[in-house]
Amino acid sequence: MSQALTLARPYARAAFATARDEGAFAPWSDALAFSAHVAVDPRVAALLANPELGRDDAVALLAPVSHGETYSRFLAILAESHRLPLLPEISGMFDALRAEAEHVVKATVTSAAELSAGELDAIKVALRKRFNREVDVTTAVDASLIGGAVIDAGDVVIDGSLKGKLARLQTALAN
C-alpha cells in the first residue's frame, strides 16, 4: 500500500497543479473519481493489465464523457507509464490536496445509531470551531459502538463512543 502511495504521489501533485492552473478542481476531482471507480472493476483491471490494450483504448475506457483534453493527456501519461492501476490512490491524494487548498477538513462521523439533522449540525459547528475551517462530514453507522460516536478528521480521532469509554475504563482498572 505504501509503495502505491509513493508511486501515486507525483501524479496526484501534477494533476492538482494542472487543476489549480485551470481553476477546475471540481471537474478534475469528478473525473479522477470516475476513472478510479472504473479502474478498480475486476473486468476493467484485467483489460488494463493486457499488454495488447493500446494507450488510446485505455484512455477511452477510463475517461468520463465530459472530460477535457488535458485530462485525456494525463490519462495517456499514466497509461504509457503503466500507472493506471494507481488511479484510486491518485484520486484520494488529489482530493486531500484539494481539501487542503480549499481549507476544508474531511471528517467521518461513525455513530451507534443514525444521527438526526440537529446532531449532525452540532457536530459540524463544533468541528468548524475546532479546526477553524470548513468541514465536509460523511456519516456511518456501527452498532458495535453501543452508544456515542467516533469522529475521524484527518490526523485527529475523537472517540466519544461508549465502547471506547468502556475500553479505557478496562485499561485503567487493569493498571
Swiss-Prot record:
Task: Note the InterPro entries from the entry.
Answer: ATP_synth_OSCP/delta_N_sf, ATPase_OSCP/dsu
One Pfam family for this entry, by name?
A: OSCP
Tell me what topology the record assigns in the membrane. Answer: Peripheral membrane protein
Q: Which SUPFAM superfamilies match?
A: N-terminal domain of the delta subunit of the F1F0-ATP synthase
| Primary location recorded for the protein, binned into one broad class | membrane
Localization annotation: Cell membrane
The record's keywords, sorted A to Z, are:
ATP synthesis, Cell membrane, CF(1), Hydrogen ion transport, Ion transport, Membrane, Transport
Would the keyword Transferase turn up in this protein's UniProt record? no
Q: Which GO terms describe its molecular function?
A: proton-transporting ATP synthase activity, rotational mechanism
GO CC terms in record? plasma membrane; proton-transporting ATP synthase complex
Listed under subunit, the entry gives: F-type ATPases have 2 components, F(1) - the catalytic core - and F(0) - the membrane proton channel. F(1) has five subunits: alpha(3), beta(3), gamma(1), delta(1), epsilon(1). F(0) has three main subunits: a(1), b(2) and c(10-14). The alpha and beta chains form an alternating ring which encloses part of the gamma chain. F(1) is attached to F(0) by a central stalk formed by the gamma and epsilon chains, while a peripheral stalk is formed by the delta and b chains.
Protein task: F(1)F(0) ATP synthase produces ATP from ADP in the presence of a proton or sodium gradient. F-type ATPases consist of two structural domains, F(1) containing the extramembraneous catalytic core and F(0) containing the membrane proton channel, linked together by a central stalk and a peripheral stalk. During catalysis, ATP synthesis in the catalytic domain of F(1) is coupled via a rotary mechanism of the central stalk subunits to proton translocation.
What family is this protein classified in?
A: Belongs to the ATPase delta chain family.
Q: What is this protein called?
A: ATP synthase subunit delta
Species per Swiss-Prot/TrEMBL record: Stenotrophomonas maltophilia (strain K279a)
Q: What are the top taxonomic ranks of the organism?
A: Bacteria, Pseudomonadati, Pseudomonadota, Gammaproteobacteria, Lysobacterales
The primary gene name is atpH
